[in-house]
Amino acid sequence: EIVKPDLTIEMSATPVLASKSNNFSRVTVEPSDVIEEGMIKKEVLINYGIDKIDNDELDSQKLIIEAAIEKREELVKLYKKANSRVNPLVLIQIPNSDIGEDKKNAIVSLLRNRGITEEDGRVAIWLNDEKINNSSETLVPLDSKVEYLIFKQAIDTGWDCPRAQILVRFREINSVIFEIQTVG
C-alpha cells in the first residue's frame, strides 16, 4: 500500500517439473485466492531490522536471533490489535553438519535465557534424530503455542504453515530450487 511497484514478481515454492505423461489434470487458481487463504505472503523482508540493534558486543548469531525475536514480538502486537488469533512462528534453519548441532545448542540456549523452552511448548525441534513438539497438529494451527521451530531441511517440500512469518537461516544455499521452496 505504501510502495507502488512498477513490477510484481510472484513465484511458487514448487518448481516446474517436466512430465513424461499427460495423465494429470491442471487446476488453475487465482493468485488473489491463494494470498487470501494465507498460503502466499504478500511481502518478504530480508534482514528486516538488523540495523536497529546497536549493541556491538553481540555476536552475529545472537544479533540475528534477537532481531527475529523482536520482529515476532512486533507481529504478536499487530495480530492482537487486529483481534487475530494468529501466533507467528519463527523458522530457524541450521546447517546439516556438526556445526548445525552447535548452532542448535546455541539457539536453544539463547531462547532459554529469554524463558522460551521446549518444555513450555514454545520451541519445536524437527531434526532427523531429534523431534520435539513437531507434529503438524502441534505446529500448524494458527493459535499453536509453538513460537520457534528449529530445523535442517525436514520442511522443504509440501509443508504448509501460514503462520510461519519469519525465517532465520544459518545454512548455505546449495540449490536455487531448495532456496525457493524454503522461502515459499
Residues of each region from the PLM?
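A short beta-strand element within the Helicase C-terminal
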Residues: Y148-F151, I155-I173, I177-V183
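Conserved helicase ATPase motor motifs in RecA-like P-loop NTPase domains
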Residues: I2-N22, G38
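Conserved catalytic network of the ASCE P-loop NTPase/AAA+ motor domain
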Residues: I2-K4, E37, A82-S84, V140-S144, ...
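Conserved helicase ATPase core of P-loop NTP-dependent helicases/translocases
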Residues: G121-K152
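Conserved interdomain linker/interface between the two RecA-like ATPase lobes of SF2 helicase motors
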Residues: N23-W126
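Loop/turn elements at helix/coil->beta-strand transitions in domains of secreted/extracellular proteins
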Residues: K4-L7, N87-L89, E118-V123, K145-V146, ...
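Conserved nucleotide-binding/hydrolysis micro-motifs of P-loop NTPases
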Residues: T14-A18, E36, N96-D98, I155-T157, ...
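Generic recognition of flexible, low-complexity loop/linker segments
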Residues: K77-K80, E137-T138, A154-D156
